[in-house]
């Protein structure tokens, strides 16, 4: 429990367009994310002690941005600390936060196709392209790579070398917040 700044407020803004038939559709979605709590060295040490209780077969999910008061290597530091414990670690983060942990062989990483493309400096528009670059992340150390592609579905490149492609379900998106988090949770539940 942190003593100062215990809450973080994130605001999601959606721009609606009204079509000729009067139907409203989301044309753009923007995020304004708060900074999060202040974390002291003492509080960080307590957190590390809690991590030390993890054992073989436990699952740890490292997701999202990190507070600015923590080192930018915090995910990597956590994985290094736990590497001999055989904890199954999932990382859902962007560019450097994600790439920097690959040497510690995360069980699952979950970028979206835009984040995956950003890592390699390319635009990925087909599932075949996504599979190619997901395999590159495996070569860099990830065991399983699950890539969400919004309305175009998803791709999984599994640690046994199999690849799976899925279409997105039909429907009208009301809000995409948490979609990637729920995908990672669904994968873990089904695993």
Please name every model-derived segment:
Residues 1-58:
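Conserved N-terminal subdomain of the carbohydrate kinase-like
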């Amino acid at each position: 429990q942190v003593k100062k700044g215990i809450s973080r407020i994130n605001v999601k803004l959606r721009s609606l367009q009204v079509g000729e038939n009067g139907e409203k559709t989301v044309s753009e979605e923007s995020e304004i994310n708060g900074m999060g709590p202040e974390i002291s060295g003492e509080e960080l040490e307590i957190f590390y002690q809690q991590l030390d209780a993890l054992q073989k077969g436990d699952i740890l999910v490292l997701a999202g941005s990190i507070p600015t008061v923590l080192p930018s290597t915090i995910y990597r530091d956590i994985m290094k600390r736990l590497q001999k414990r055989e904890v199954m670690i999932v990382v859902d983060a962007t560019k450097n936060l994600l790439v920097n942990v690959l040497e510690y062989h995360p069980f699952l990483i979950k970028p979206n196709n835009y984040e995956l493309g950003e890592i390699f400096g390319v635009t990925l528009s087909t599932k075949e392209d996504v599979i190619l670059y997901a395999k590159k992340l495996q070569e860099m150390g990830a065991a399983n790579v699950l890539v969400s592609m919004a309305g175009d579905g998803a791709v999984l490149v599994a640690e046994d070398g199999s690849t799976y492609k899925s279409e997105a379900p039909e429907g009208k998106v009301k809000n995409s917040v948490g979609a990637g988090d729920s995908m990672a949770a669904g994968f873990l539940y089904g695993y």
